[in-house]
């Protein structure tokens, strides 16, 4: 169908340090599990790439101009399984994830993991971001809770570290936007904007 499909990056994912995240991965996982309990969910399939990156404090280059990576996370009360492409997670990141109780599986493994959930499991899925195949993988006897992801409001409320980093980024951006017109007015007759 598509003659020129974009190639997925082969670059490995990397960890976002606590100096940027402001909250440890284990604490975020605990907060999401508490939200799952509030919703009456036994399992939660995280499907939105930005939510996955935020929750695990990982970043990647799989999508142009967006620091996310392709993957899914199946979170239960006791377990967390990150499903990502082969080679996406290096040994150092793997060890860090394992220290926080996150196991790894193949990207396509999410469907089998969801199908293997026991009868009576209440699976939280955000229908706005979950793909059809995943929604159809929920086994008979399990209940799908099609609700907005609890990660969205958590991501929206910035902690003190995130707020300070946003201030710094806006300051740097403001300086760049202020300098550009000055540079533009000083162009010589033979120069173009591309020369800046």
Question: Residue spans of the language-model regions?
Answer:
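Conserved small/polar residues in nucleotide/adenosyl-binding loops
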Residues: 1-5, 185-192
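N-terminal accessory/capping or targeting/presequence segment of soluble
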Residues: 3-116, 171, 176
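Extended, domain-scale alpha-helical bundle/helix-rich regions
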Residues: 12-35, 39, 122-156, 161-176
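Short coil/turn segments at secondary-structure boundaries
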Residues: 46-49, 126, 150, 178-182
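A glycine-rich phosphate-binding loop feature that marks nucleotide/adenosyl-phosphate handling sites
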Residues: 49-52, 128-130, 188-191
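Phosphate- and divalent-cation-binding pockets in alpha/beta enzyme and binding domains
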Residues: 54-55, 133-134, 179
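C-terminal structured domain segments across diverse proteins
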Residues: 114, 166, 172-179, 187-191
């Amino acid at each position: 169908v598509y003659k020129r499909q974009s190639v997925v990056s082969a670059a490995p994912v990397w960890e976002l340090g606590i100096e940027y995240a402001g909250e440890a991965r284990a604490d975020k996982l605990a907060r999401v599990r508490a939200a799952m309990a509030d919703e009456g969910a036994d399992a939660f399939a995280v499907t939105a790439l930005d939510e996955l990156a935020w929750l695990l404090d990982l970043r990647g280059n799989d999508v142009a101009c967006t620091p996310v990576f392709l993957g899914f996370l199946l979170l239960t009360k006791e377990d967390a399984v990150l499903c990502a492409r082969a080679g996406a997670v290096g040994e150092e990141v793997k060890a860090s994830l394992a220290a926080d109780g996150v196991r790894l599986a193949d990207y396509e493994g999410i469907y089998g993991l969801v199908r293997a959930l026991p009868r009576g499991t209440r699976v939280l899925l955000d229908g706005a971001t979950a793909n059809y195949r995943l929604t159809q993988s929920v086994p008979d006897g399990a209940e799908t809770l099609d609700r907005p992801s609890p990660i969205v409001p958590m991501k929206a409320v910035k902690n003190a570290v995130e707020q300070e980093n946003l201030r710094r980024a806006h300051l740097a951006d403001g300086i760049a936007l202020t300098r550009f017109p000055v540079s533009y007015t000083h162009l010589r007759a033979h120069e173009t904007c591309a020369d800046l």
